[in-house]
From Swiss-Prot:
GO BP: methanogenesis, from carbon dioxide; methylation; one-carbon metabolic process
Domain of life: Archaea
InterPro entries documented for this protein: MtrB_MeTrfase (IPR008690)
Signal peptide stretch: none
Keyword Repeat: no
Keyword Coiled coil (UniProt): no
Membrane association type: Single-pass membrane protein
Keywords annotated in UniProt: Cell membrane, Membrane, Methanogenesis, Methyltransferase, One-carbon metabolism, Transferase, Translocase, Transmembrane, Transmembrane helix
Name of the protein: Tetrahydromethanopterin S-methyltransferase subunit B
Major enzyme class: translocase
Enzyme Commission no: 7.2.1.4
Reaction equation(s) it catalyzes: 5-methyl-5,6,7,8-tetrahydromethanopterin + coenzyme M + 2 Na(+)(in) = 5,6,7,8-tetrahydromethanopterin + methyl-coenzyme M + 2 Na(+)(out)
Provenance organism: Methanosarcina barkeri (strain Fusaro / DSM 804)
Length: 108
């Protein structure tokens, strides 16, 4: 945010954004907020990416194009794998219990 000095001997300045002309004061300091706004925009993009990471269909900030459903497919295949493993373990345990019960049926 810069000021245009209209008449330096009278301390008159103009704000180019609003078009107002005012007297320059020595006791006030004016800072440019552009670097702050750039960082806030960058943090906003990162926050949006964090929220998008919760949805499997939205692309992530640093991912390649065309990989929108990668998280969905990885979750599907991962859960299918663990489901098969747990199902086989449960079936094996059930078969073992049935086998032991059949062995004990002749003894008892």
């Amino acid at each position: 945010m810069s000021m245009i000095r209209i008449a330096p001997e009278l301390n008159l300045v103009m704000d180019p954004e609003t078009g107002t002309i005012t007297q320059e004061r020595k006791d006030s300091i004016q800072y440019s907020m552009e670097p702050v706004f750039e960082r806030v925009d960058k943090l906003d993009a990162i926050a949006d990416d964090l929220v998008n990471s919760l949805s499997p269909s939205n692309p992530l900030l640093n991912s390649w194009p065309g990989r929108e459903n990668t998280s969905y497919m990885a979750g599907f295949y991962g859960n299918t794998f663990y489901g098969v493993i747990i199902g086989l373990a449960f079936s094996g345990l059930l078969a073992l219990v049935i086998y032991i019960a059949s062995l004990m049926r002749g003894v008892v």
